[in-house]
Structure formats: C-alpha cells, structure tokens
Amino acid sequence: MTSDEFAKNFYLEKLAFLKSCFEAQPEQPSAVNVKIKEMALTEHQTEKLKEVIDILLDDVFYTILLGLDGESHIGNTQQVYKIYDQDDNLISDCGELEASAYEYFHESKYEKESH
C-alpha cells in the first residue's frame, strides 16, 4: 500500500461515516443517525447539517493524517510516525502522507478520479 492509497482509504472511511449519519433506512443506524432523525429537521436544515458534518469529518481525518505524518500534533505530542502495512512494507515515511491527504481532503482528488 502506498501513502496515496492510505490517504484514499481514510477519505473513503470519511465518506462512509458521512453517509451513515444521513441514511434514511440504515441496517444498523449509528447513534448520530438516530440523533439527527430525532431532530426532525427540514430538508434545508438537513443539508446544512450535512455540510457542517462533512467539513468536521474532513478536518478530523485530515488532522489525524497530518499527525501521523509529523506535520501536526496528536494530543500534546508532535512527532513523525512510520506506518507499515501488514506485510511490513513502509506506507509512509515523512511528508508523503500530508501531500496525499491534502489532495483527497482539500482538492477533491477522489471525486475527480471517479468522474
């Protein structure tokens, strides 16, 4: 796995979280999904909330990836982490992950590739 694939997988996970928050009939509703339904929002309010949660998830996932890359704090610690896949291949050394994460979370790389 490359650092680009790793960042893409984080982005796909973010999309799955966002979808689970707003699914009409989920098999296993998340706590967030239940709370949003309890709010009985209008369609416009639901879209605005979805935008807010989308931005929040972007910020959270992107910041975690930056933290793993040593570009940001995780808690009170800022250091570079080396990430390996299950076959002991180095996924990310220093700096590679930040560049890929930026492309996915701020430049819509996934959406551009999908269309």
Please tell me what each predicted stretch does.
Residues M1-Q45, I74-N76:
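N-terminal low-complexity, intrinsically disordered segments
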Residues T2, S30, S92-E103:
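Secondary-structure junction/capping motif
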Residues H44-A99:
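Amphipathic protein-protein interaction modules
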Residues K8-N9, Q79-K82, S100-Y102, S108:
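Intrinsically disordered, low-complexity segments enriched in small/polar residues
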Residues M1, Y102-H115:
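Short acidic DE-rich linear segments
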